From Swiss-Prot:
This protein's pathway: Bacterial outer membrane biogenesis; LPS O-antigen biosynthesis
Residues reported in the UniProt entry to bind NAD(+): 11-13, 32-37, 55, 81-84, 101-102, 130, 171-172
Listed EC numbers: 1.1.1.335
Reactions this protein catalyses: UDP-2-acetamido-2-deoxy-alpha-D-glucuronate + NAD(+) = UDP-2-acetamido-2-deoxy-alpha-D-ribo-hex-3-uluronate + NADH + H(+); 2-hydroxyglutarate + NAD(+) = 2-oxoglutarate + NADH + H(+)
GO BP annotations, alphabetical order: cell wall organization; lipopolysaccharide biosynthetic process; O antigen biosynthetic process; polysaccharide biosynthetic process; protein tetramerization; UDP-glucuronate biosynthetic process
Protein task: Plays a role in the biosynthesis of B-band O antigen for serotype O5. Catalyzes the NAD-dependent oxidation of UDP-N-acetylglucosaminuronic acid (UDP-D-GlcNAcA) to UDP-2-acetamido-2-deoxy-3-oxo-D-glucuronic acid (UDP-3-oxo-D-GlcNAcA). Cannot use UDP-GlcNAc or UDP-GalNAc as the nucleotide sugar substrate, and can use only poorly UDP-D-glucuronic acid (UDP-GlcA). Undergoes an NAD(+) recycling mechanism using 2-oxoglutarate as an oxidant.
Keyword Flavoprotein: no
Tree of life domain: Bacteria
Catalytic temperature dependence: Optimum temperature is 30 degrees Celsius for the coupled WbpB/WbpE reaction.
Entry keyword set: Cell wall biogenesis/degradation, Lipopolysaccharide biosynthesis, NAD, Nucleotide-binding, Oxidoreductase
Species: Pseudomonas aeruginosa (strain ATCC 15692 / DSM 22644 / CIP 104116 / JCM 14847 / LMG 12228 / 1C / PRS 101 / PAO1)
Name of this protein: UDP-N-acetyl-2-amino-2-deoxy-D-glucuronate oxidase
Length: 316
């Protein structure tokens, strides 16, 4: 049994990490968040210590190191995006391996610095890239490898996850903290595309705002038109008033079944990490580079057949 601490315990994604820790037979012994809305801990690990001040959390973690039976093995990080880097560094320097939510960090330069800290501490950093464990994604990757098509696949990626007025007033709506909508809700999709279709060759942005972004990505084996949004007005008429989220991936005009299979992906990710097969800094580098380019890109009009259909609707 491994001992875990969790940073960002009141966040949206934290319960998935808590359950993954429990479901893999391990123990959450300490948790931290500046907010105290963490009642979920009662149903998962009621014996866990909890702190609302980081200094006390660090002191407790350091004290646990005095006994090998209580010392932390892993620190899981679910804090806001802009705090990932300092929290990862703190976890590694505590002498722990670290598991961090996406996006790992906003820039390749920060990845380089974390690699230095890994070497200094002789500990490992793992990123949650859960779509690599989704059975539909694995099946598509295998199909692409098997077919060895001489032509690039034509892919449309659409992801709309409706958010209310609170969104822009939270850290998620502040691009200095979330790094923008394409990073916050899209980074795992860019990792998925790289995982399936190989190296990125072109990265063009056609539209970006605080609510949505769109562009074109060309990989070794695919041409991808993408559209991401947190605006409910972008939902197709077929789902408006029925579902708050719309997720669609078409490959050569064929809709990929991608509506189920997300429930246990964090647990699968933890199982792989604990078995020594987790995804580290080098695995995350491609998607970090992709979103870093998107954030700084000059917006250009879509060339023929490179613009996502939803972008044309925005211009009307």
């Amino acid at each position: 049994m491994k001992n875990f601490a969790l940073i960002g315990a009141a966040g949206y994604i934290a319960p998935r990490h808590m359950r993954a820790i429990k479901d893999t037979g391990n123990c959450l012994v300490s948790a931290y968040d500046i907010n105290d809305s963490v009642g979920i801990i009662d149903s998962i690990s009621p014996q866990s210590e909890f702190f609302t001040e980081f200094e006390f959390f660090l002191d407790h973690a350091s004290n646990l190191k005095r006994d090998s039976a209580t010392a932390l093995d892993y620190v899981s990080i679910c804090s806001p995006n802009y705090l990932h880097y300092p929290h990862i560094a703190a976890g590694l320097r505590l002498g722990c391996d670290v598991i961090c939510e996406k996006p790992l960090v906003p820039t390749p330069e920060m990845l380089d610095q974390l690699a230095v800290i890994e070497r200094e501490t002789d500990k490992r950093l793992y990123n949650i890239l859960q779509l690599r464990h989704h059975q539909a994604i694995i099946a598509l990757k295998d199909k692409v490898a098997r077919e060895k098509s001489p032509h690039k696949y034509e892919v449309d990626l659409t992801y709309i996850t409706s958010r209310g007025n609170w969104y822009l007033k939270s850290w998620k709506g502040d691009p200095r903290k979330s790094f923008g909508v394409a990073t916050n809700i899209g980074v795992h999709f860019y990792d998925m595309l790289h995982f399936i279709f190989g190296k990125l060759q072109r990265n063009v942005v056609h539209f970006t705002s605080e609510y949505k972004a769109a562009g074109y990505l060309e990989y070794e084996q695919a041409r991808v038109r993408w559209f991401l949004s947190v605006d409910a007005n972008d939902l197709p008429e077929s789902v408006k008033g029925k579902k708050p989220t719309y997720r669609s991936i078409t490959v050569n005009g064929e809709e990929m079944e991608f509506s189920e299979g997300f429930t246990d992906l964090h647990t699968t990710s933890y199982e792989e990490i604990l078995a020594g097969r987790g995804y580290g800094i080098d695995d995350a580098r491609h998607c970090v580079e992709t979103v870093n380019t998107i954030r700084s890109a000059v917006i250009v009009p879509a060339s023929d057949n490179e613009g996502h259909p939803f972008v044309a609707a925005l211009a009307r």
